[in-house]
Amino acid sequence: MNQTGKLFGVGVGPGDPELMTLKAVRLIRECDIVFVPGKVPEETVAYQIAVQAVPEICGKKLVGIHMPMTKNQELLRKSHEEAVATTAGYLEAGCNCVFLTLGDPCIYSTYIYVHKQLSKQGYRTEIVSGIPSFLAVSAKLNEGLVEGAQMLHVIPATYQVEEGMDLPGTKVFMKSGKALGKVKAAIQKADLDGKMIERCGMPGEQIYNSVEQFPDEAGYYSLVIAKEKEGM
């Protein structure tokens, strides 16, 4: 019996293809199958980042993995099961596979659901880190994220804005787009400094250096950093 293939969850970073790791590039070149989160692989952001760093990906077999953006737990469960079954089929055939994900696979990633199930089933899996969006945003703003004994909190803006504002230290609000009005109001109420980048490292990048500049709504790839004002 042939040995099953191995699955690599590969972070392609936040948007700038030059921020992809050497390991990510090598694995994409060497793999048999590339899984991409989306119905049409070539149209996904993850693929569009990767193809700039690894043009050879065009010659790979691409498999779209559809995972809907929904809070409906039944729909999510079904999509996860389908993704696991699809991925396992290629692993059983002995294919070494890469599953692309934006940023880092460990942070709010669609990949991690597949990873956990396949690992439990005994398949060989490996997570390959990528640069997370909040680190890229902090670097693009040309400033540090935390210093000394400051705490760092990463918060999904679509769920827990109010609870997050009560936490001490620097607050990162991910996926802020549709919740931006709520995030903006919460930052102003708490009298914090807020900055945001939309589409960091991608075409159409927009930088907002103060909370007053924030629109009431932005695109999906919008990330907000809120800090205590200097001198407080």
Region roles according to the model:
Residues 67-73, 160-162, 202-204:
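A short acidic, often aromatic-flanked loop/helix-cap motif at beta-alpha or helix-coil junctions
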Residues 41-43, 132-135, 202-204:
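Short gly/pro/ser/thr-enriched loop/turn and capping motifs at secondary-structure boundaries
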Residues 1-17, 22-24, 29-123, 209-215, ...:
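Class I S-adenosyl-L-methionine
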Residues 106-167, 215, 229-232:
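Class I SAM-dependent methyltransferase SAM-binding "motif I" and its flanking Rossmann-like core
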Residues 36, 61-66, 127, 147, ...:
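Structural signal for conserved beta-strand scaffold positions within catalytic alpha/beta enzyme cores
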Residues 14-17, 40-41, 158-160, 175-179:
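Short beta->alpha connector loops
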Residues 7, 165-232:
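A contiguous loop/helix-start segment that scaffolds small-molecule binding in enzyme catalytic cores
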Residues 74-77, 110-111, 138-140, 164-166, ...:
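Short, well-ordered secondary-structure micro-motifs
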